[in-house]
Amino acid sequence: KNDIFLAFKEAVSNSLEAIKSKKKLQPNYERASIVISVYAKSDTANEESFDYMIIKDNGIGLETKGFQRFCQYMNSSKGYNNKGTGRFFLLKSFKKAKYESSYLDEDGKYYDVYFDFSIENRANDLFINIISEGESSKTDSETSLMLLPFDCDKESIRRYNPFLNIDAVK
């Protein structure tokens, strides 16, 4: 039952790989960052519970080839010993994963892609719903992944990650 932790680890690992890929393309790139934000809500009994989490990086972005890889199970072309299985932890642990990504394409222009990855999208075999894609006004690449909602209580989170101070998250 470590699915939530594995999903979180997968998301952070993807951010680290995106930063590493950007450094290969831009050797002078030094502003690497990953920001993790966890949001909670109060229920009717005034108990805090997880509402959603956002993991944002300023790595390479989910460019066209990366998105095509994302759409193929067992595709190892990314490298880093990946096979495309980690995203299924997201499906099992969260109701929906919302991606917003900006990337620099081969034509020298920035593009945005917004899509949902969810069991709700089971009408297609990929579980993907593309919301929009097109040219961007941004001048740097980045990806935000919103994971919502957690389907467990505080004690479950403590059991999976005893180092997370859930009581401090408001």
PLM feature spans:
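Short beta-strand-loop-beta element adjacent to the nucleotide/active-site pocket used for signaling
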Residues: Y39-M53
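Beta-strand secondary-structure signal
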Residues: V35-S37, Y52-I54, K98, S144-M146
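Short helix N-cap motif at coil->helix boundaries in the Bergerat
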Residues: G61-Q68
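GHKL-type ATPase core
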Residues: S77-K170
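Mobile ATP-lid/nucleotide-binding loop of the nucleotide-binding subdomain
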Residues: Q72-M74
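Short loop/turn segments at strand-loop or loop-helix junctions that form parts
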Residues: A11, S37-K41, L145-D151
